[in-house]
């Protein structure tokens, strides 16, 4: 890369990086500006999401009252921007509203202490009290009751959906939740007219639920990336992902979008939902206005209404790679000015490398691309200080192959195991693996994480070879982030803390490399853990599996060195015991008699 070309690129990148695509206007009343930009319907939806994500135990009706009051105030400010308090920031207005709730301390305890702070510390305090694992009952869809609610009051139905999802997922990407609420309403508009409502509704609700849970996990990872590793980490992630998806767009264009995408997500992660949604709409508008230079896959997206448009852009298919790309080695190994370019503008040079490498490797996971970029950076940092830098970094690309081989081999082995055992058996294998690695982690967390890790088989193993790596590693990043988020609240394992905090891009390799914890002191055998009742027979299959897997974790915590043969025998006997009692005329009586015998059996097998 010639120096004059690089300087031109640096100037363009620096300008785009600092400026982005948004205008940074100031307004007399921020809340009036957002209300006018978003419109009343979306404004009310976003305010409802904001309150629900902070006050997760509050009844829906209380939130509706708060939303109504904020909306009326916003309308006052639209009519007269100089009216009392209209010049206050949205953070201040929102925080004041929370702190005015009389029962705040009674229902939320320490959250009320935040009210003694000033902005922005008060808002940061509110964020720290969000609960990623709230004690809220699982929703069980009743098609007849739901259709009755939908037909009685569509607006309330829409609001309750936002409320229920937001309070269970306090970092859900708010404008995307508005999109899913539209899809949810559409499902009910169609299925509540059907003769068999359940047959129409239940598969569609389950399909939507999977998409919503994945969306929640993706946003939680983005927020964790920004909160724990800084904005630069998120920008690097976005640069790699967008370069893969839009390989025809030039580096400066991608950099502009990355800068503003970081702003949008930082706003949503910090609870600035109105500004986040407004800026996301502006970014979608910019991308569509410039789609000719960004991607050929956006036309269909750009013809859609706002929420569908933004969602469609985020999920857009990868564009074809330009045919005239030079080999990467030309600019990043063979060019004699590599060290000069690197030293003069490290971030731009490394960003260019990541952009060029990512657009050529749509089959790699983002984490792998970032690990490769880290190795390239470390090599230049070392070589550019030596007497003959070109000779030193001449073989840098050879260092990348082991980074690629490691996840490929791991995925191959695990997919073979998945094919052999099936999903439930594969989950059990992962439960054994992770309980031995980090037995200090709570049993519910180990079961949840292992079950989700096990889903990588059905999600990714049947995909074409060129899609497997990115599918598996990107999905595993979401699941391991869930483990890290839960563990941060109640840290019990130094190994988990180390893997979670040292490097975002090396999390998965760190967890994969963990060995069984030989320092762990086994738990005492608790008979109550292996006591079961008649309700086990009527549980849905997934809940029945969770009961069995919970027992498996507890078994391993008692006997961490149990052999595969011992565990297989115990699980086989357990299945036979459950089958016998669930087939008996009196389930409870059978469990009462056979249960103690089963416990004696377990202890004998593991002795």
From Swiss-Prot:
One of the record's GO molecular function terms: toxic substance binding
Binding site for Ca(2+) 1: 30, 267, 272, 275
SMART domains, alphabetized: ALBUMIN (SM00103)
UniProt subcellular location: Secreted
Amino-acid positions noted as binding Zn(2+) in the UniProt annotation, renumbered to this chain: 91, 270, 272
Domain Albumin: 19-209, 210-402, 403-600
Range of residues in the leader sequence: 1-18
Gene3D superfamilies: 1.10.246.10
N6-succinyllysine: modified positions: 228
Residue positions where N6-methyllysine is found in the record: 557
In-chain residues carrying the UniProt-annotated modification Phosphoserine: 29, 82, 89, 442, 512
Chain positions recorded as Ca(2+) 2 binding sites: 37, 278, 282
Protein name, UniProt field: Albumin
